[in-house]
A protein has these predicted regions:
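C-terminal segment of classical bacterial N-terminal signal peptides
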Residues: 1-7
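Carboxylate-rich, polar loop motifs that coordinate divalent cations or form catalytic acidic clusters
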Residues: 7-645, 681
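Solvent-exposed serine/threonine-rich low-complexity stretches and specific carbohydrate-binding patches
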Residues: 58, 683-690
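Glycine-centered coil/turn sites that cap beta-strands in beta-rich domains
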Residues: 641-673, 691-694
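Short, glycine-anchored, charge-dense loop/turn motifs used at functional sites
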Residues: 671-682, 709
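Short, surface-exposed loop/turn motifs with a glycine/proline- and acidic-biased composition
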Residues: 687-718
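Edge beta-strands of extracellular beta-sandwich domains
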Residues: 721-726
């Protein structure tokens, strides 16, 4: 087995990098020069001559994510993308043309496209709304066949076949056929002939030896105008491809070659859990799209296979991004979405590689991975039902809860809801709906200690945050009262914070994240906005306590916004992820908006932000959404006490360049004065940590003239200085 693999590339300042998962490939199409493969949320291309791989994403100007179907224009070069929301892109070497007619159509029905069929100058888009016909010459949608179900009810169309003067359709309720004659109204369901109603059909094709259609694991053939049962396979059929005298048939577990006289298995998954989704013969190789093993290339009759994939996490649905050193970890479960996916992902900023790890113990996979920490270069993972484990990069794991000590499993589950670490090297763990609900674990001697507070709401802890003085902040399940229980196991003091004034004054009792900034303020994200506590050391001192909320544009910052996660960057600026409104970046105090990224003004794949993590050396912000992960490289990086390896780029600056000029390697939070060669001040800039940007404009916001400009950089006290030169052409 050989691998063709492309790893992540370095990202420019203020640039974006996609981090989609390429593990599960759903479909493939063959162009003249490239193969195109679609995952759930993105596309990649394989150069048929060189075998090189490249990404197609919103970063390089696609208009959407979540792919429904792929197709090709008659030229064999222009890729057609039908998205799950009804949007359509036509992608050629020279341009990307968008058609949003279906996307913009107002309906409560799903608009997902499921297949694309090319017929001369007409392109047929089949999907949940029915069939949409796009005419190439008129560059518009010319027909739409909706509500083709019995009695005119909505009916999902999975694939269409054009043969002579007729159109056939594989649908969720049988097979349909209608005449393409100009005098036939195909928008009227009465003009469609129905066969085998009650059966859901996924595919329909025409070969030199007949028509075939697939329903679940059954293959049907059309003879003398009637559809009859032909063959049953051992697993559901996922795709049919006609090769004239042969048919490639893929089921969930095997690929078969069907001729007029035989049915031969040419590839199977050997019970490894891999699901086959699609198959394609490009004349030289057979390509198999799978869940689990990305895109495989087969040579008929040979045992050797090749795997083609790009670097990325194990899943597009990743939670709880956590930074430890230069590594960011993602897990595939969260308290509100437990699943048995037994893997987690690690992104290493030093070598810019993703590593996907499948942990197991005594040969059994570990699922419901809800949290991760790294301590002394060891990885510890929390499985909601199976407990705490120490694991390595190979996935070999050791259970750390024994029957002799520590938490107790009830009904085959520990209900381990979160873990974190303290400055003394202990791991703190919460156990949901348990009388003993908070424990500390000492990895040096594998010992557990019950540290449960007395407050009844602590029983329903979903997350733990440890304050700068060691106080434990326990986020409480909103379904059990919500809010925060703060306690200190040494002083035995505790306090419950909620939305009531004087008792915390939180915007909401639904607490989603708690973070500490560089001023030792504790920021709390809730379903109704953001708040912060300026003195976390005094939380347990008693007295009235109400959280502060920044004021932005004469109102409470992000009031009524569902905040999902908080990130603090090296400039102490605040990043806020939201459930439906993208991601916001505010100044240190929260009073100045710097960026607000949504799907409409950025490559974000979704406005539903699940989590974020900031790597301070590069300034890269990893953002996970419900439709995949993406990174934005901000201009805030961790600073040092002196200038180190100062770089200015681009330099020289071309006349056509309109982006930001980046100056990095500066002393922490340097003050920069930019002058012309005569010493006239052009611009003053302050670095965010060790990085500053200049837009090439002067104090009056006019673009500077061609020439040489000097950058004088100095530390806050003026003792550490540096001079750089920028050439504007």
């Amino acid at each position: 087995m050989c691998f063709q693999h492309v790893k992540a590339q370095n990202t420019p300042v203020l640039g974006w990098r996609s981090n989609f998962s390429y593990t599960d490939v759903k479909s493939i199409v063959k162009g003249n020069s490239s193969l195109y493969a679609a995952t759930e949320n993105t596309i990649f291309a394989i150069d048929r001559a060189e075998g090189s791989l490249s990404k197609l994403t919103k970063i390089n100007d696609l208009n959407d994510v979540s792919v429904g179907a792929l197709g090709l224009m008659p030229d064999g070069e222009t890729l057609i993308i039908g998205y799950q929301n009804g949007n359509i892109d036509f992608v050629s070497d020279s341009e990307i043309k968008n058609l949003s007619t279906v996307k913009d159509f107002e309906t409560t029905q799903s608009k997902q496209f499921r297949s694309i069929t090319n017929n001369s100058r007409d392109i047929y888009f089949a999907g949940d709304l029915g069939v949409v016909v796009y005419n190439i010459d008129r560059d518009e949608i010319t027909e739409a066949y909706q509500n083709l179900g019995q009695e005119g009810k909505p009916l999902s169309i999975n694939q269409v076949l054009i043969y002579n003067d007729s159109i056939f359709a594989a649908t969720a309720d049988g097979l349909l056929a209608a005449s393409l004659a100009s005098n036939i109204n195909r928008q009227d369901f009465n003009n469609w002939e129905r066969s085998l109603p009650g059966l859901a059909f996924s595919n329909i094709i025409q070969t030199n030896f007949g028509f075939f259609a697939a329903s679940d694991s059954d293959l049907f053939k059309r003879e003398n105008g009637n559809w009859i049962f032909y063959q049953n396979l051992s697993s559901p059929i996922t795709h049919l491809e006609s090769l004239g005298n042969e048919v490639l048939v893929s089921s969930e577990t095997q690929v078969l070659n069907l001729t007029e006289s035989s049915l031969e298995s040419i590839y199977n998954t050997e019970g490894d859990g891999t699901r086959i989704n699609h198959v394609l013969n490009d004349g030289s190789f057979i390509w198999v799209a799978t869940d689990g093993l990305s895109l495989q290339r087969l040579i008929k009759g040979a045992s050797e296979t090749g795997i083609y994939t790009l670097d990325g996490p194990t899943s597009d649905l990743s939670y709880n991004a956590e930074l430890f050193g230069s590594k960011i970890y993602l897990n595939t479960s969260t308290f509100s979405d437990l699943n048995e996916e037994n893997s987690f992902s690690l992104y290493n900023h030093e070598d810019r590689n993703w590593l996907n790890i499948k942990p197991s113990t005594t040969g059994e996979p570990i699922g419901q991975i809800i949290d991760l920490v790294q301590l002394n270069d060891e990885i510890y993972l929390a499985s909601y039902d199976q407990g705490l484990f120490k694991t390595n990069l190979a996935g070999n794991s050791e259970a750390l809860i024994s029957s002799n000590s520590g938490p107790v499993s009830i009904n085959s589950s520990y209900n381990l809801s979160s873990i974190t670490t303290d400055e003394e090297g202990l791991i703190w763990a919460s156990f949901y709906d348990r009388e003993s609900n908070v424990f500390s674990f000492d990895p040096s001697n594998n010992s557990w200690e019950n540290q449960s507070p007395s407050h009844p709401f602590a029983r329903y802890t979903t997350d733990i945050f440890i304050g700068p003085n060691g106080d434990k902040w326990l986020s409480v399940d909103p379904n059990e009262g919500g809010g925060i229980v703060v306690y200190n196991e040494t002083s035995n003091r505790e306090r419950y914070l909620n939305l009531n004034g004087g008792q915390g004054g939180l915007p909401s009792n639904v607490v989603t994240d708690i973070e500490l900034d560089q001023d030792f303020f504790v920021w709390v994200a809730t379903s109704q906005g953001i708040a912060f506590f300026t003195n976390p050391y005094g939380i347990l001192e008693g007295g009235s306590l109400t959280a502060s909320v920044p004021i932005f544009e004469n109102r409470l910052l992000l009031r009524n916004e569902y905040i999902t996660d908080i990130g603090i960057d090296p400039a102490n600026r605040k990043w806020f992820g939201t459930k439906s409104n993208g991601i916001w970046l505010f100044s240190e105090t929260g009073e100045e908006l710097i960026y607000h990224f949504t799907i409409n003004n950025s490559p974000l794949p979704s406005n539903n932000i699940l989590s974020l993590a900031i790597e301070p050396v590069s300034g890269e912000v990893l953002i996970t959404t419900d439709k995949g992960a993406i990174s934005f490289r901000s201009d805030a990086t961790i600073g040092t006490d002196e200038h180190q390896n100062v770089k200015v780029y681009p330099n020289p600056v071309a006349p056509s360049y309109t982006g930001q000029i980046v100056i990095e390697g500066l002393v922490n939070n340097a003050q920069l004065k930019i002058t012309d060669v005569s010493g006239k001040l052009v611009k003053e800039v302050r670095a965010n940590g060790s990085t500053a940007i200049w837009n090439g404009r002067d104090l009056n916001n006019a673009r500077v003239k061609s020439g040489v400009y000097l950058v004088f950089s100095a530390s806050q006290d003026g003792l550490e200085t540096y001079v750089a030169k920028i050439v504007i052409i």
